[in-house]
Amino acid sequence: MAVPKRRTSKTRKNKRRTHFKISVPGMTECPSCGEYKLSHRVCKNCGSYNGEEVVSK
């Protein structure tokens, strides 16, 4: 079984992990109520999507 010959340094480990991060979700402002919502989803505050009321409150 293969075993590492040298210990991986902190610098090398951190360089490898530079792309290992969480991306920020795409938030847009709701045109109906002005609250921030996830893109391409129904607004949780007013229940509208694409300018139409989809969920009645």
UniProtKB/Swiss-Prot annotation:
It comes from the Bacteria. GO terms for cellular component: large ribosomal subunit. InterPro entries: Ribosomal_bL32, Ribosomal_bL32_bact, Ribosomal_zn-bd. GO terms for biological process: translation. It holds the Pfam family Ribosomal_L32p. One of its GO terms (molecular function) is structural constituent of ribosome. Keywords: Ribonucleoprotein, Ribosomal protein. Belongs to the bacterial ribosomal protein bL32 family. This is Large ribosomal subunit protein bL32. It comes from Staphylococcus haemolyticus (strain JCSC1435). The lineage of its organism: Bacteria, Bacillati, Bacillota, Bacilli, Bacillales.
